[in-house]
Regions:
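Short beta-alpha connecting loops at secondary-structure transitions
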Residues: 1-2
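Short, cationic-aromatic polyanion-contact patches
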Residues: 5-12, 27, 57-66
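Short amphipathic alpha-helical interface segments
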Residues: 8-37
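Short amphipathic alpha-helical interaction segments
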Residues: 36-50
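Glycine-centered, phosphate/nucleic-acid-interacting loop/turn motifs that mediate DNA/RNA or nucleotide
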Residues: 53
Length: 66
């Protein structure tokens, strides 16, 4: 089974993904502040992105792009 090369991201998800590619590992609170999303919106977005396989959570509320 080959991993899907391209994943369709929503525009807001693409903003977060590009941010994580640039920053590497980052705290959820910092992502929310820098990208301008409320935490309650960002947490759902991060979950969707994790399920799509484009980011992964790390201990301590850190996230990174895969």
């Amino acid at each position: 089974v080959q991993k899907q090369m391209f994943v369709d991201l929503q525009p807001d998800e693409q903003i977060v993904y590009d941010y994580l590619l640039q920053k590497g590992k980052e705290l959820m609170d910092t992502i929310a502040l820098d990208c301008g999303f409320p935490i309650y919106v960002l947490s759902g977005m991060l979950l969707n992105m994790e399920l799509k396989g484009v980011i992964r959570p790390l201990p301590g509320k850190l996230f990174e792009a895969i």
